[in-house]
Swiss-Prot record:
Consequence the record notes for mutating E640Q: In a breast cancer sample; somatic mutation
Impact when changing E278K: In a breast cancer sample; somatic mutation
Protein's name according to its UniProt entry: Drebrin
GO molecular function per UniProt: actin binding; cadherin binding; profilin binding; protein sequestering activity
Superkingdom of origin organism: Eukaryota
Phylogenetic lineage: Eukaryota, Metazoa, Chordata, Craniata, Vertebrata
Record PTM Phosphoserine, positions in chain: S141, S142, S337, S339, S345, S416, S601
GO CC term, one of those recorded: postsynaptic membrane
Length: 649
């Protein structure tokens, strides 16, 4: 905000002011206003009529300043009044801007006694202004008025004196009084100075005491801190000592346990080595390798499907020849106990298996017997077929086996799948295993076995069934190297049911009395032998022992063993290794338990054998396999019962 300016019309302003304050001049008032549109102050008018004339020159649209001289009858000198006129029609913004100019205007016009603010003529009252001047509210000092008074004093007349004679006593009292007060004043100053020094000393002493106390407190805190640190350090050392002792004790215990563990491991290793050596020694004492038995049986089973069957009187029923090929019963395989399976999965069992492999690879295979004559191979007898079936069935036992509940043969009617499978297997094995030198005594025994088979099955004709004796004979007695009561049948035969019609004539049935019959067992003893499942003896460890077969030729019929049939099959076609090989060859699919007794490779060989023989129907296998495990057969130790059994043979 810009202030009032006196530079533009300064001379005019001062000239009018001098005219008013000079006593010789007749003018007693002057009126000032702003120049249009600016803050420059200028002279508007002046006159000699006093307040009455000045009040008539104020305008309502402007801001104006009136300087007037008022004479009082009681005062010797005139009084000066400054009137601040703000018209009623002046804008508010202009009023605010000019409000700060009043002080500067009063300073410019020196000697102003009273400042009167007015916005109308009624506000300018000569009586009110005179009252304010007489009450002493106006200023009494002014540079102009001071000069005027000095001028009046110079013109004044001299006055009389007021001197009086000096009194010594009074003067001494005055002097003494003054000295006393001066001395008192000095003493007071000294006292104050001493008090100030004492206060300063007290403050210094207090500060020193405070600092000393703080130092002592700091030392006490440091002492307590050091004591605490010492306690902590001592506790830490004790803790470390305890931890070191605990670590030593633990290390000592670990060393003791480690030595004990090492001793146990060494003892276990020695025991394992002794078990391996013992197993190797036991395996080395075996005359034959059980693995070769499974190979031979597998090859016989694979080749039997491809061979062409010769018509026999017992297989001329409609559908019997087809069912015999479709329903082939799997050869029973011995199962393993849980203890054997758990042993095979241990490192000791693995070492035993490796030792078995080494011993097996070092043993030469048994020599096969001479091949059978061509006549009997081409035209096998049904009696020999049934005998081969009964003789091959016990050879499937290779160790102690726990027979499951479902192993018992269910009741079968005429033409059941199990009976057809029995005839099919007998016929095919008879083709492969025809006897080399038929004997009269052996033929008698074979004749009885054929009669027993015809009695157990219902697939033969009624006329043939009538010619067979009803007594049941223990077929296990025909097993070579087995002795009396060595084994019993696994299934219970049922009485045959005659078929509805006679489809096989007597002319097709061979004469059964061409050889001398063997004396039959008593009826009670035969039934007890067939039906007693609780007294089954354990078969020997090996079944393919040529020496045992030769040694017991009088008690059993001399039939060609499996190696002879195997030799014939190898001359015709070399089959692929199948799932029944005991760990020497890798299983093709690894799903023997889910796909059935025969693996996929055997099914392929059966498919190839069908091309060789157009008369043979496609084989049908069962999907439910026997619950056995033959993967680690050689790793199983020979039980004591088997050793005693072999010793008895």
């Amino acid at each position: 905000m810009a202030g009032v300016s006196f530079s533009g019309h300064r001379l005019e302003l001062l000239a009018a002011y001098e005219e008013v304050i000079r006593e010789e001049s007749a003018a007693d008032w002057a009126l000032y206003t702003y120049e249009d549109g600016s803050d420059d102050l200028k002279l508007a008018a002046s006159g000699e009529g006093g307040l009455q004339e000045l009040s008539g020159h104020f305008e309502n649209q402007k801001v104006m300043y009136g300087f007037c001289s008022v004479k009082d009858s009681q005062a010797a000198l005139p009084k000066y009044v400054l009137i601040n006129w703000v018209g009623e029609d002046v804008p508010d913004a202009r009023k605010c801007a000019c409000a700060s100019h009043v002080a500067k205007v009063a300073e410019f016009f020196q000697g102003v006694d009273v400042i009167v603010n007015a916005s109308s003529v009624e506000d300018i009252d000569a009586g009110a202004i005179g009252q304010r001047l007489s009450n002493g509210l106006a200023r009494l000092s002014s540079p102009v008025l001071h000069r005027l008074r000095l001028r009046e004093d110079e013109n004044a007349e001299p006055v009389g004196t007021t001197y009086q004679k000096t009194d010594a006593a009074v003067e001494m009292k005055r002097i003494n009084r003054e000295q006393f007060w001066e001395q008192a004043k000095k003493e007071e100053e000294l006292r104050k100075e001493e008090e100030r020094k004492k206060a300063l000393d007290e403050r210094l002493r207090f500060e020193q005491e405070r600092m000393e106390q703080e130092r002592q407190e700091q030392e006490e805190r440091e002492r307590r801190y050091r004591e605490r640190e010492q306690q902590i350090e001592e506790h830490r050392r004790k803790q470390q000592t305890l931890e070191a002792e605990e670590a030593k004790r633990r290390l000592k215990e670990q060393s003791i346990f480690g030595d004990h563990r090492d001793e146990e491991e060494e003892t276990h290793m020695k025991k394992s080595e002794s078990e391996v050596e013992e197993a190797a020694a036991i395996i080395a004492q075996r005359p034959d390798n059980p693995r070769e038995f499974f190979k031979q049986q597998e090859r016989v089973a694979s080749a039997s499907a491809g061979s062409c069957d010769v018509p026999s009187p017992f297989n001329h029923r409609p559908g019997s020849h087809l069912d015999s090929h479709r329903r082939m019963a799997p050869t029973p395989i011995p199962t393993r106990s849980p203890s054997d399976s758990s042993t095979a999965s241990t490192p000791v069992a693995e070492q035993i298996e490796r030792a078995l492999d080494e011993v097996t690879s070092s043993q030469p295979p048994p020599l096969p017997p001479p091949p059978p004559p061509a006549q009997e191979t081409q035209e096998p007898s049904p009696i020999l077929d049934s005998e081969e079936t009964r003789a091959a069935a016990p050879q499937a036992w290779a160790g102690p086996m726990e027979e499951p509940p479902q192993a018992q043969a269910p009741p079968r009617g005429p033409g059941s799948p199990a009976e057809d499978l029995m005839f099919m297997e007998s016929a095919e094995q008879a083709v492969l295993a025809a006897p080399v030198e038929p004997a009269t005594a052996d033929a008698t025994e074979i004749h009885d076995a054929a009669d027993t088979i015809e009695t157990d099955t219902a697939t033969a004709d009624t006329t043939v069934a009538n010619n067979v004796p009803p007594a049941a004979t223990s077929l296990i007695d025909l097993w070579p190297g087995n002795g009396e009561g060595a084994s019993t049948l696994q299934g219970e035969p049922r009485a045959p049911t005659p078929p509805s019609g006679t489809e096989v004539t007597l002319a097709e049935v061979p004469l059964l009395d061409e050889v001398a019959p063997e004396p039959l067992l008593p009826a009670g003893e035969g039934c007890a032998t067939l039906l007693n499942f609780d007294e089954l003896p354990e078969p020997p460890a090996t079944f393919c022992d040529p020496e045992e077969v030769e040694g017991e030729s009088l008690a059993a019929p001399q039939t060609p063993t499996l190696p002879s049939a195997l030799e014939e099959l190898e001359q015709e076609q070399e089959p692929e290794p199948h799932l029944l090989t005991n760990g020497e060859t890798t299983q093709k699919e690894g799903t023997q338990a889910s796909e059935g007794y025969f693996s996929q490779s055997q099914e392929e060989e059966f498919a190839q054998s069908e091309e060789l023989c157009a008369k043979a129907p496609p084989p049908v296998f069962y999907n439910k396999p026997p619950e056995i495990d033959i993967t680690c057969w050689d790793a199983d130790p020979v039980p004591e019962e088997e050793e005693g059994f072999e010793g008895g043979d």
